[in-house]
């Protein structure tokens, strides 16, 4: 990448990151003012942690680090069709894994919340609220994972602006959902925080729609392909396995930290 496109990419990513950080601060202030401290806040924050933990593994970091070099190499050495075939197989495999993970998570959510926040067992209302909210927010995981996967394809093509705007969409939708909290101010904890959980899913759907539109417009949207695990695909997943080791260790540490906080 020459100096001029590199500078433009830096401005785009840096600008969107700065806007996202400001909106993230606004989001936290609005949460504190409208949701406050209590069972609703505790339950929602634990529910929000769950998809974010898995996202580090399936969306950011390990997956991107493994896929982007493989996609760029296939594009350079074997042509556009081979690169898009790799992307299509990876997309299908990733989606199948994520759907299975969501099904398992939804089924065993009480045990998962008991692991993340063992102290909630002493207050059944808080535990039940966290379980319900986590079941609502957990489907955000495949949404944001596919968004990050599509963003990696766009980035490999030198298109950074839309991908960098994804956190901005997330924060705007969450702030909007927070302003619905006063409507539920007299409700139970789970119902009081439900506007935020719904806003999270809306953010995921909007992020998917925006990224999908970009890829379709630029003819970069991968087709769904049944995985055949050819040599480039196997090499990519081997790289993912290596890269995920560090991410898994980090997430285990975060789970331990979160469990200690909520003892």
Q: Predicted segment positions?
A:
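Membrane-embedded alpha-helical bundles of multi-pass transporters/translocases
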Residues: 1-261
């Amino acid at each position: 990448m020459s100096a001029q496109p590199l500078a433009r990419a830096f401005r785009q990513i840096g600008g969107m990151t700065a806007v996202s950080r400001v909106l993230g601060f606004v989001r936290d202030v609005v949460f504190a003012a409208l949701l406050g401290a209590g069972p609703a806040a505790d339950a929602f924050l634990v529910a929000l942690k769950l998809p974010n933990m898995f996202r580090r593994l399936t969306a950011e970091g390990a997956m991107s680090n493994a896929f982007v070099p493989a996609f760029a190499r296939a594009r350079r050495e074997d042509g556009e069709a081979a690169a898009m075939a790799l992307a299509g197989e990876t997309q299908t495999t990733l989606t199948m894994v994520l759907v299975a993970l969501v099904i398992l998570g939804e089924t065993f959510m009480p045990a998962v919340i008991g692991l993340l926040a063992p102290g909630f067992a002493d207050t059944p209302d808080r535990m039940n609220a966290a379980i319900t909210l986590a079941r609502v927010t957990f489907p955000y995981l495949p949404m944001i994972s596919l968004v990050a996967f599509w963003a990696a394809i766009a980035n490999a093509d030198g298109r950074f602006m839309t991908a960098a705007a994804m956190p901005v969409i997330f924060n705007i939708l969450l702030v909007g959902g927070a302003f619905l909290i006063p409507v539920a101010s007299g409700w139970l904890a789970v119902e009081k925080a439900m506007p935020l959980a719904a806003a999270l899913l809306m953010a995921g759907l909007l992020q998917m729609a925006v990224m999908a539109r970009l890829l379709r417009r630029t003819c970069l949207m991968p087709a769904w392909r049944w995985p055949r695990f050819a040599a480039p695909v196997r090499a990519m997943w081997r790289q993912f396995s290596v890269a995920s080791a560090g991410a898994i260790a980090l997430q285990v540490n975060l789970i331990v930290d979160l469990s200690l906080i909520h003892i």
